[in-house]
UniProtKB/Swiss-Prot annotation:
ANK repeat locations: 717-750, 762-792, 796-826
Gene name, Swiss-Prot/TrEMBL: Camta2
GO MF: chromatin binding; histone deacetylase binding; sequence-specific DNA binding; transcription coactivator activity
Record field: compositional bias (Low complexity): 294-305, 319-328, 829-853
Name assigned to this protein: Calmodulin-binding transcription activator 2
Subcellular location: Nucleus
Length: 1208
């Protein structure tokens, strides 16, 4: 600055002194006028000239910010007085989505470096909708308050003739904001941006209008991704539903039988020539040619923008009879999810019809299969048939096809073969399909019916759509129902026809149906009527809502803004036809909590007492982002609907393959009776009903006699089939599985999948899942099945009831607690039954009619479900019930357990399996029904085998112990002994192997005692056993116990069994002792390490303490030493001074003091500075003393003089 000539300029308004280069002021003239608009960017010189014309700034300044200035506007602001950045436009933001993205630059003027004088600065921002629209702000760094703002669409003049439309932001982080706007808001944004711009295709066609540009934005930028009702498992992850994914997997389609709507396209045929393509062409997928569509309204575009892909419909060529065209055909396609292999889908070219029909009609294609009777059921499980051929109990899946009946006078209906392979729609979505019918030449309108395969239930009116009013000249004709012969109708005419001479089809618009999008993507439960779409445009719009998504568990607080002001109104929010209460937090803001729902997009709407109050918006349910396992235990008990459904089907397929392998090996499954048909009323969701039907069809065909186990690979999260059913809340499936388990009691494969005490990777039982997710009916069924699951904690130590309380399922927890109290109140211990009168055995025991494997521990469960079958509440039993009645009285499908392990022989007669628990608990009162036909329960009293074996060994006679057990019994032995000897060695080896491995089975109780909570059987003393065993030889009590005595061989067998048990227990005890020693050694080693660490810490602490004490002592001693040293120095100085003073006093007169300096030797007396000071003090004291002595002498002399006046 000091090396160049500068000019001082003072601004009039702020009196600021701005120093600018003299060369700059000479080359830039002052501007007399600021142009309000300029359709090009200003040069740097022009910008600088505007900013340095200070005398005109007061005249040019704008006092208020302008809202959405037009293209080319130039405005001057004072940033201290006007917030010019709030101009109404939406500018690009940074990646964080909060701050605007700005580009800053220093500008050169006349080639002068800005660093040399630091005067001109610029800031640029770009539009988020049209990236070529900029706002540039300029100011002087020495005068930053005055800002020159210029709005301009950059390629306005250069690129107008090159393309057919401007460039829009296709991928932007801000799209979520501006794509929520309505058509009017987008028009308000774009009109000022394209002010003064003329767009054309350069081929003589008419210019584009801003309305067409807005329509193009709405067509090419969908507001939301295509609705996905579940996360696809075929892709890389579970996904959040943000990408459109097509999958033809069978399980994929079974899990989500919803309609994935695609775009609706209409092609109308005029009288004379095909329609010309409009200037705006809606985009289609790259593999399909673009269909000619007319631009529809804004609501139509916004409503259909979430569809996956548009359809392509090729219009039929016009034909004429007698030189004039009489009509045409328009087809509205509403396709389903997928296509069959080899079929021609509606997304491909539609072949023109062979014979065009004269009247103009509009057919709704909603079916996928031709009307044909279903094939007979095959014995093997076919997933494709499971999807496409609904059987009894199906509540979704749609009809077999469409059978439109055209009651026309001339011509017969020839269905288009290309329309048949489309996928089927569910009845609810099909009933809401759109079928406008237009008549011609005074003919009556046609009626279209959507028919199911074998259901004669008529769909009522609430699910239909009211008629759309036709054009003013046409009068609606009264529709007449024409049901096909032999079948009941499943729908009504959705639109009435219009009689008139016009054959042109009106363009189809979704503006009258704000809820169509939400209805198409919803999966409504049967029996719940859908709310009728509102035709009136008086519905308010939801301005904003947050958050926009939730996990499938729901419970997230959602705030919704809009024109809600009535405090007395009873507001509710409808999530996919699930209404939840809403409260008015403040005027314009509603608060609600979203319900649980499966993954996908759902419609959200605000409703009042009299009906809907707002239009629908899209709310998203996202899947949790984990592939197989949650990251922590806290995220474990969460519903992953699609994965659970997939896993259920995988388990059923594996079981079906297992059955097929058994059948192929020669063990043909027994042909049992067919399962009874399931009623349609109250059967729950469709997926559960169809799985129940599949399981019921597998029950009579199943045979599980092989000892092999199913190889499942890696099960989903360690969850069994019963886990998955409980997590989904499928009570009917749980009941069916319990019936299957009761029928097949000896199946280890079935025990792996259907065990109420089985646990997953985090030790959660099926009852834990049902309690955590609030499925009351399923939880009660599982509790009735085996109440022991209520006391099994997960890996965090939480019990099912505590999890239910913590998650807000209070009603479920109270119901289970009440059932538990009822069972505990009716329990009574059973007395011992009288001894059995069987001549073959001398032990009173209960023979189990089931296989031996029922009494063993479950190898897939940490807790065995076999020993303790938890029965439902039953009246108390008499105390004299015999123990033989136990097998017939075990309830709830729990397998019976032999009282003793040595009672290994099963009876040949199989008793019928007991029925499982009563019907599911009623949802209204939570109490079990009175007529539950469950048999009464009897407690199974356990026996301590170790103590019993010891008593048996002590009581066995010595001669029995000394006998060689391996010898063959003598000829006089009973036939029972002969037959028993053959399998005795096998029995003993089996018993020994069992007892060797019994501790390896996972069990919560110690091996010495079974996991029971009831009283134990009293062990008889040794004398009683001796008396009992010696009764066969002594002859005592033969009259009373002749039938209860044991033979020598039986006694020897009993003795060997007791020895095996005792030996196994000793081995187990030694092994346990060794394990305890190892654990103790590890504990001692760990404690010793800790002790050494603590000892070293204590030693360091003691050392530190001693060092501290020593430092304190040293410091105190040093202080005292220093004080003593100072005292001694001062004392020596005082003595020296005193000596000098005494010598001075002894002198007769004042010493003659030479005028010169003191000799050098005298200086040596004052060694230190303090001594010098002390000497000076002493000298001052001596001078005062000398002066006082003089005064005293003078006073004495004055007193000695005679006083005047006294002489006489």
């Amino acid at each position: 600055m000091n090396t160049k000539d500068t000019t001082e300029v003072a601004e009039n308004s702020h009196h600021l002194k701005i120093f600018l280069p003299k060369k700059l002021l000479e080359c830039l003239p002052r501007c007399p006028l600021l142009p309000p608009e300029r359709l090009r960017w200003n040069t740097n010189e022009e910008i600088a000239s505007y900013l340095i014309t200070f005398e005109k700034h007061d005249e040019w300044l704008s006092c208020a910010p302008k809202t959405r200035p037009q293209n080319g506007s130039i405005i001057l602001y004072n940033r201290k007085k006007v917030k010019y950045r709030k101009d109404g436009y939406l500018w690009k933001k940074r990646k964080d989505g909060k701050t605007t993205r700005e580009d800053h630059m220093k500008l050169k003027v006349q080639g002068m470096e800005p660093v040399s004088w630091q005067c001109l600065y610029g800031c640029y921002v770009h539009s988020s909708i049209v990236p070529t629209f900029h706002r540039r702000c300029y100011w002087l760094l020495q005068n930053p308050d005055i800002v020159l703002v210029h709005y301009l669409n950059v390629p306005a003049l250069e690129d107008c003739g090159k393309g057919c439309s401007p460039i829009f932001c296709s991928i932007s982080s801000d799209r979520r904001e501006w794509l929520k706007w309505s058509r009017e808001e987008l028009l308000g944004q774009l009109k000022p941006m394209f002010h003064g711009i003329k767009w054309s295709c350069g081929n003589g066609a008419e210019e584009f209008s801003v309305e067409q540009l807005v329509q193009q934005i709405l067509d090419t930028h969908p507001t939301k991704p295509a609705p996905r009702t579940h996360a696809c498992l075929c892709s890389g992850g579970l996904g959040s539903g943000s990408l459109t994914h097509k999958c033809s997997s069978t399980k994929h389609r079974i899990i989500s039988p919803k309609v994935e709507p695609r775009a609706l396209a209409l092609a109308s045929i005029s009288h004379s020539k095909p329609p010309e393509p409009p200037p705006l062409i809606a985009p289609l997928p790259p593999e399909l040619p673009k269909a000619h569509t007319s631009p529809s309204s804004s609501s139509s575009s916004s409503s259909s923008s979430g569809f996956a892909e548009p359809l392509e419909i090729r219009p039929s060529p016009p034909t004429s009879r007698g030189g004039s065209s009489r009509g045409g055909t328009a087809i509205l396609l509403l396709t389903g999810l997928e296509q069959r292999a080899g079929g021609l889908t509606p997304t491909r070219h539609l072949a023109p019809q062979a014979e065009p029909r004269p009247p103009v009609s509009l057919a709704v294609v909603v079916g996928s299969e031709p009307s044909a009777p279903p094939a007979p059921p095959s014995p093997a499980f076919d997933p494709d048939r499971f999807l496409n051929s609904p059987q009894r109990g199906q509540t979704y899946g749609g009809g077999q096809g469409v059978n439109p009946d055209f009651p026309e006078a001339e011509g017969t209906h020839t269905p288009c073969p290309a329309l048949e392979p489309a996928a089927a729609l569910e009845p609810q979505a099909a009933a809401r399909g759109l079928a406008p019918q237009l008549g011609a030449n005074g003919r009556r309108g046609n009626k279209f019916f959507i028919q199911d395969d074998d259901s004669g239930e008529e769909l009522k009116g609430p699910g239909t759509v009211p008629p759309v009013p036709s054009s003013p000249p046409s009068s609606p004709s009264s529709p007449t129902a024409l049901p096909p012969s032999g079948r009941a109708t499943r729908g009504e005419a959705l639109f009435g026809g219009s009689a008139g001479s016009s054959s042109e089809l009106e363009p189809f618009s979704l503006s009258s149906f704000p809820d169509l999008m939400g209805e198409l993507i919803s999966d409504e439960a049967p029996g719940v009527p859908a709310p009728a779409p509102q035709l009136s445009p008086a519905l308010n719009a939801i301005t904003d809502f947050s958050p926009e998504w939730s996990y499938p568990e729901g419970g997230v607080k959602v705030l919704i803004t809009g024109p809600w002001t009535e405090a007395a109104e009873h507001y509710s929010c409808v999530f996919d036809h699930i209404a939840v209460p809403a409260s008015l937090v403040q005027p314009g803001v509603l608060r609600c909590y979203c319900p649980a729902h499966e993954v996908g997009l759902v419609s959200l709407q605000v409703a009042g007492r009299e009906g809907p109050l707002s239009a629908s918006v899209l709310f998203e349910y996202r899947a949790r982002r984990f592939l197989s396992l949650p990251s922590t235990q806290l995220d474990w008990l969460s519903l992953d609907d699609s994965q659970f459904r997939m896993s259920i089907l995988e388990r059923l397929e594996q079981m079906e393959k297992r059955m097929a392998e058994i059948a192929a090996a020669g063990q043909a499954p027994g042909q049992g009776p067919e399962a009874p048909p399931i009623q349609d009323e109250g059967q729950g969701p469709g997926f559960e009903a169809r799985v129940v039907v599949l399981v019921e069809s597998m029950i009579p065909r199943s045979t599980w006699r092989g000892p092999e186990r199913l190889i499942h690979g890696s099960p989903f999260r360690g969850m069994s089939l019963l886990h998955l059913a409980a997590a989904q809340g499928y009570a009917r499936l749980i009941e069916t599985l319990s019936q299957w388990r009761s029928v097949e009691t000896g199946s280890l494969d079935l025990e792996q999948e259907v065990d109420p005490l089985n646990v997953d990777h985090f030790s959660c039982t099926p009852l834990m899942w049902a309690c955590a997710l609030g499925h009351l009916e399923a939880a009660v069924l599982l509790f009735c099945w085996n109440r022991q699951a209520l006391s099994i904690p997960d890996s965090l130590g939480r019990l099912p009831l505590s999890v239910a309380h913590s998650r807000g399922h209070v009603r479920l927890a109270r119901c289970l607690e009440e059932l538990q109290r009822q069972e505990l109140s009716v329990e009574h211990p059973l007395a011992l039954s009288p001894p059995s009168s069987s001549p073959d055995t001398g032990l009173s025991s209960a023979s189990s009619p089931s296989e031996l494997s029922d009494g063993t521990f479950s190898v897939t469960s940490a807790y065995s479900s076999a020993p303790d079958g938890s029965p439902p509440p039953a009246p108390p039993l008499a105390s004299d019930i015999s123990m033989e009645m136990i097998p017939g009285q075990l309830s709830c499908g729990a397998p019976e357990t032999p009282l003793l392990l040595m009672d290994y022989e099963a009876t040949n007669s199989k008793e019928p399996a007991p029925s499982p628990c009563g019907p599911p608990l009623a949802q209204d009162n939570g109490a079990a029904p009175e007529d539950a036909d469950s048999p009464p329960a009897v407690d199974v009293i356990p026996v301590d085998m170790i103590s019993l074996a010891k008593q048996i060994i002590d009581a066995t006679p010595e001669r029995i112990k000394r006998e060689d057990f391996s010898e063959f019994p003598d000829a006089g032995a009973s036939p029972r002994e002969h037959t028993g000897t053959v399998g005795l060695s096998e029995t003993m080896s089996w018993l020994a192997s069992y007892l060797e491995n019994v501790d390896h089975f996972p069990s919560s109780a110690p091996p010495s005692e079974l996991p029971f909570e009831r009283g134990r059987l009293a062990i008889p003393p040794a004398p009683s056993w001796a008396e009992f065993l010696s009764a066969s030889t002594s002859g005592k009590m033969e009259s009373d116990f002749a039938l209860l005595t044991l033979s020598d061989h039986e006694q020897r067998e009993l003795y060997e069994a007791a020895r095996v048990i005792q030996t196994a227990f000793r081995k187990y005890k030694g092994r346990r002792l060794k394990e305890q020693q190892e654990v103790a050694a590890a504990v001692i080693q760990r404690c010793y390490r800790k002790y050494k660490q603590l000892t070293w810490i204590a030693l360091k602490f003691a050392l530190y303490k001693k060092m501290t004490q020593a430092a304190i002592l040293i410091q105190s001693k040093f202080r005292s030493y220093y004080e003593q040293k100072r005292f001694q120095q001062s004392r020596r100085a005082a003595v020296l001074i005193q000596q000098h003073y005494r010598s001075y006093r002894r002198r007769p007169g004042p010493p003659h003091r030479p005028s010169g300096p003191l000799p050098a030797r005298n200086k040596g007396t004052f060694l230190t500075k303090k001594q010098d000071q002390a000497a000076r003090k002493i000298m001052r004291f001596l001078r005062r003393c000398r002066h006082r002595m003089r005064e005293l002498k003078q006073n004495q002399e004055l007193e000695g003089l005679p006083q005047p006046g006294l002489a006489t």
